Amino acid sequence: MKNVQTLKNYIGGQWIESTSKQVEDVPNPATGEIIARVPLSTKEDLDRAVATAKEAFKTWRKVAVPRRARILFRYQQLLIENWEGLAKLVTLENGKSYKEAYGEVQRGIECVEFAAGAPTLMMGEQLPDIATGVESGMYRYPIGVIAGITPFNFPMMVPCWMFPLAIACGNTFVLKPSERTPLLANRIAELFKEAGLPDGVLNIVHGAHDVVNGILDNEDVKAVSFVGSQPVAEYIYKTAAANGKRVQALAGAKNHSIVLKDADLSSTVKEITSAAFGSAGERCMAAAVVVVEEDVADELVNRLLQEANAITIGNGLEEGVFLGPVIREGHKERTLGYIQSGVEQGATLIRDGREDDIANSQGYFVGPTIFDNVTQEMKIWQDEIFAPVLSIVRVKDLMEAIHVANASPFANGACLYTNSAKAIREFREEIDAGMLGVNLGVPAPMAFFPFSGYKKSFYGDLHANGKDGVEFYTRKKMLTARY
């Protein structure tokens, strides 16, 4: 039997065994093979990491901002040099195709690049003459120990949304990565240390509920950034805020793609197919629902079916694979339950991903699944499935399509496929979502713009990334002086 390592926590620049005896297997989702074991760390482990980060903050906050930036530039270079290995590790523990993993690493590197602009990002503001002989200035400062709680679906990109910018702003950080994808977090911590980051500035504590609750209860944690499911996001937001912490919690999604009759169907079908089935549908920007004008619905459905049938399913490390597995057997069973629900509630199942056979595989595969004639009363329209399941709703016109999309309790993203400038303006003004796309499938912004939406897709005031991220990780002091 292959010897499987049990991961350690990263505290104060050292790899330290958890005080917990509980561990959880980490399988390769494409094969079922156990590749590591992750400790379900205790509150004691978490408190030790926070205390270490608090002590490191005393000196890190006083490090000159340009020096912090130079460390981040070295870190960026190391990530670039290790790009392929990082991408393979993402695929190994998450299951997405190597091509998608390679792109995810790129997005993480871009986040570090943005954070390296800290000398500009941290600038304050001054007004020399607010009154005769009186001037006033705003100065930015770090806030202390930040905690990040990240999901399994982007083990590289989402942590890189958080800790590089927080650290660039002078904070110290405790990261709790998903227990389902813990390997990548350890690797990027190693590279940050190699780049010259002082011990204690970045710490990693593996685990589940006990670590999360420890973060929320620890008074030395000043802010919490979270990305994950809606129920957990709501819990974290309410609990952290009640404990006086600054909090941003990015939650679920049910993104609608609206297709008008004047759309270029060739490019539209390719965009929707990639957005719906890429990363096995396990992303908050996935295309979950297509809302199409009746005049082109039949043709669109036929083309989507043809495109889905051409998808190669398998181990993401194999050449040419587009669709990998979902993350765990339990998530596969949950997805199959939603497919059965769609059938029972009367949707037309035009492609059944349950029938895709992956030869000799013990992995957690679900093939591309497409439902037509979906209505708002159905669970497959209402719930975030987080899997390669696409629902199609037929409507008469753009306003009905917007009405359908806005009826969702989620408001993360939405897309419009059209050649009409008037329709684009109407869509922009009337749609209730935070990230909008026109003639593209995944309108995720770059690191210098804020990420996230509204309603049950986001809890908080300041979004991740961009200027919002800088605001979240800093506090302001106003100095008014008479001379």
From Swiss-Prot:
Protein's name in the database: Malonate-semialdehyde dehydrogenase 2
CDD domains from the UniProt entry: ALDH_F6_MMSDH
Alphabetic keyword roster: NAD, Oxidoreductase
Pfam families per record: Aldedh
Function: Catalyzes the oxidation of malonate semialdehyde (MSA) and methylmalonate semialdehyde (MMSA) into acetyl-CoA and propanoyl-CoA, respectively. Is involved in a myo-inositol catabolic pathway. Bicarbonate, and not CO2, is the end-product of the enzymatic reaction.
Subunit structure: Homotetramer.
Catalytic site positions: 284 (nucleophile)
NAD recorded as keyword: yes
Transmembrane regions listed in the UniProt entry: none
Binding positions (NAD(+)): 152, 176, 179-180, 229, 384
EC number of the protein: 1.2.1.27
SUPFAM superfamilies, sorted: ALDH-like (SSF53720)
NCBIfam families: MMSDH
Family: Belongs to the aldehyde dehydrogenase family. IolA subfamily.
PROSITE patterns with a match to the protein in the record: ALDEHYDE_DEHYDR_CYS
Protein's GO biological process: inositol catabolic process; thymine catabolic process; valine catabolic process
Pathway(s) this gene product operates in, as recorded in its UniProt entry: Polyol metabolism; myo-inositol degradation into acetyl-CoA; acetyl-CoA from myo-inositol: step 7/7
Sample GO molecular function, one term: malonate-semialdehyde dehydrogenase (acetylating) activity
Recorded catalytic activity of this chain's protein: 3-oxopropanoate + NAD(+) + CoA + H2O = hydrogencarbonate + acetyl-CoA + NADH + H(+); 2-methyl-3-oxopropanoate + NAD(+) + CoA + H2O = propanoyl-CoA + hydrogencarbonate + NADH + H(+)
Keyword Nucleotide-binding: no
HAMAP family for this protein: IolA
Gene name linked to the record: iolA2
Domain of life: Bacteria
